[in-house]
Regions:
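N-terminal helix-turn-helix DNA-binding core of bacterial DNA-binding proteins
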Residues: 2-38
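Short, hydrophobic-biased segments on the C-terminal half of alpha helices
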Residues: 47-48
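Residues marking the start of alpha-helices
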Residues: 1-2, 62
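A short, conserved structural fragment
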Residues: 51-61
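Basic, amphipathic "hinge/linker" alpha-helix immediately C-terminal to the N-terminal HTH DNA-binding motif
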Residues: 62-75
Length: 75
C-alpha cells in the first residue's frame, strides 16, 4: 500500500484539483497554478508527489485525474 499521509500543502493541491475537475471536467497544470496562484514548477513537483502516493493520475501534458483514494482525501 502506498503512503497516503500528506502535508496540508499537498492537500490544498488535491482540493484545488477536485474543484477544477468539478467545474471543468478536467484539470491541467496551468489551471491548477492559476487556481492556487503559484508557479507551474511548484505544481509539477506537487503533482509528482501526489502521483507517487497514488492519489492522482499524472502524466506531463495531459489532464490530471484523481484516483479514488485522492478523491476521498480531497473530500
Amino acid at each position: 500500500m502506498k503512503n497516503t499521509t500528506i502535508s496540508s500543502s499537498l492537500e490544498d493541491y488535491l482540493e484545488a484539483i477536485a474543484e477544477i475537475i468539478e467545474e471543468q471536467g478536467h484539470a491541467h497544470t496551468k489551471e491548477i497554478a492559476d487556481h492556487l496562484k503559484v508557479k507551474m514548477p511548484s505544481v509539477t513537483n506537487a503533482l509528482q508527489a501526489l502521483s507517487a502516493r497514488g492519489l492522482i493520475h499524472y502524466q506531463s501534458h495531459s489532464p490530471v485525474f484523481l484516483t479514488p483514494a485522492g478523491a476521498e482525501t480531497a473530500a
